[in-house]
Amino acid sequence: MLRLPTVFRQMRPVSRVLAPHLTRAYAKDVKFGADARALMLQGVDLLADAVAVTMGPKGRTVIIEQSWGSPKVTKDGVTVAKSIDLKDKYKNIGAKLVQDVANNTNEEAGDGTTTATVLARSIAKEGFEKISKGANPVEIRRGVMLAVDAVIAELKKQSKPVTTPEEIAQVATISANGDKEIGNIISDAMKKVGRKGVITVKDGKTLNDELEIIEGMKFDRGYISPYFINTSKGQKCEFQDAYVLLSEKKISSIQSIVPALEIANAHRKPLVIIAEDVDGEALSTLVLNRLKVGLQVVAVKAPGFGDNRKNQLKDMAIATGGAVFGEEGLTLNLEDVQPHDLGKVGEVIVTKDDAMLLKGKGDKAQIEKRIQEIIEQLDVTTSEYEKEKLNERLAKLSDGVAVLKVGGTSDVEVNEKKDRVTDALNATRAAVEEGIVLGGGCALLRCIPALDSLTPANEDQKIGIEIIKRTLKIPAMTIAKNAGVEGSLIVEKIMQSSSEVGYDAMAGDFVNMVEKGIIDPTKVVRTALLDAAGVASLLTTAEVVVTEIPKEEKDPGMGAMGGMGGGMGGGMF
């Protein structure tokens, strides 16, 4: 009989054979100094070259293979950056760090990702070069950040607020690669729903772009039964000046809604019932009365699920001046309904797919209070899904929703255009937030003289400031290069011209950028520079890079299979 220690001694080697990953992780590959930096820089260059071709009005598109469906055609910098994954792990680390720059800029400003990428490449490249000659990377980073702070302060001085719809259209047009139609449609949308209104972008069903304004509270639930239809045209139910009964619970008994029907009848008003569901006896009686005596009523399921449904019903109650029955903490019963418990709306339109409550008669102060509550929730939530739902609710309570429907002849065309529309929309919002500066890379060029007055603490910090001076020329040079002209000559000529003169790459001429409407949002330029400098200067301080060496998989069990086959053969003979 074996003792326990002997058994354990026999088991230990077995566990190592069966589960090597439990005892040891992947092996690592380590590179130091110039070797590591050179490989990372190759990755940075590859990504930046791919992104840079999209810059400016004469920038080209990039075609990206997708794991499913047609290839994606895009001129959006962040989409190109995200698609790049390099085989060499050291090159990939460099590429991924610059990819982060594009992502951060996109999340914060919604545009300017190409500018951020070319700026990051320039700072990293120059930084690596100086470090190889013995400069101190930490002091270079300090010099870079010192210069960036000075540039941002100068950008704020140059910035002008956006005041007219024309300026909004100009910002959107530039960001949409010179497409005036997109610029005008975004300007119209902002005019109609307000500068802080919700604007969403969707695939259209036609060849042309369309703008749909949804005012009031629209939600994606239609009538429960088609027998509620009261218009022959359009298969919908329409009422003017109606009462609204809101319930969190299912309504099955007709007795529970008779009091509400009597109130509506006494006041000669139609009744809209919005509940978790209306079924059984309640639904059949409503339909029967609708058909026999022309009862003006429609039943609709409440939108959303769980907490989202509760919140939307509460929003409807506040917007219409009613109450929600079945709400936790309230002792309201449907049988005890009073006229002041019913919401009031000027117009109701219900189709088989959606319902719209227009001109709600809710108390303005209560609506404003509810809007503030939603804004506060927006500030603290981190979930993208939650933010989307809160924004939708906010729009329904405030100025309504503008839907931009992007048209085109194929999915590929619509998707490419949708990228540009989204960029243009983000740029426009950024411009409204922080104002505008000269476009075409000119704003950064006009900041170069401000760096002359800086006093660095040492020579290495001075090198960092010089790196930023040269980097600020890169966006204008890239735009010129993509237009087929010599970038350095264009930059020199802009620097010698008056403050508002820049290069119009589309026309191939030097023009007054403000008069021509070639402008950029201050927030986009500021964010692009700040994100690029932060990541790229940190990249230059790296001395060691550690990557994993993937474990080579051995052929699983082919030998055993062969043995098994032999055994079977032997058994059969």
UniProtKB/Swiss-Prot annotation:
The modification Phosphotyrosine is found at residue 90. GO terms for molecular function: apolipoprotein A-I binding; apolipoprotein binding; ATP binding; ATP hydrolysis activity; ATP-dependent protein folding chaperone; cysteine-type endopeptidase activator activity; DNA replication origin binding; double-stranded RNA binding. This is 60 kDa heat shock protein, mitochondrial. It comes from Homo sapiens (Human). GO terms for cellular component: cell surface; clathrin-coated pit; coated vesicle; cytoplasm; cytosol; early endosome; extracellular exosome; extracellular space. Homoheptamer arranged in a ring structure. The functional units of these chaperonins consist of heptameric rings of the large subunit Hsp60, which function as a back-to-back double ring. Interacts with 2 heptameric Hsp10 rings to form the symmetrical football complex. Interacts with HRAS. Interacts with ATAD3A. Interacts with ETFBKMT and EEF1AKMT3. Interacts with MFHAS1. The lineage of its organism: Eukaryota, Metazoa, Chordata, Craniata, Vertebrata. There is a cross-link at residue 551 (Glycyl lysine isopeptide (Lys-Gly) (interchain with G-Cter in SUMO2)). It is linked to Spastic paraplegia 13, autosomal dominant: A form of spastic paraplegia, a neurodegenerative disorder characterized by a slow, gradual, progressive weakness and spasticity of the lower limbs. Rate of progression and the severity of symptoms are quite variable. Initial symptoms may include difficulty with balance, weakness and stiffness in the legs, muscle spasms, and dragging the toes when walking. In some forms of the disorder, bladder symptoms (such as incontinence) may appear, or the weakness and stiffness may spread to other parts of the body. Leukodystrophy, hypomyelinating, 4: A severe autosomal recessive hypomyelinating leukodystrophy. Clinically characterized by infantile-onset rotary nystagmus, progressive spastic paraplegia, neurologic regression, motor impairment, profound intellectual disability. Death usually occurs within the first two decades of life.
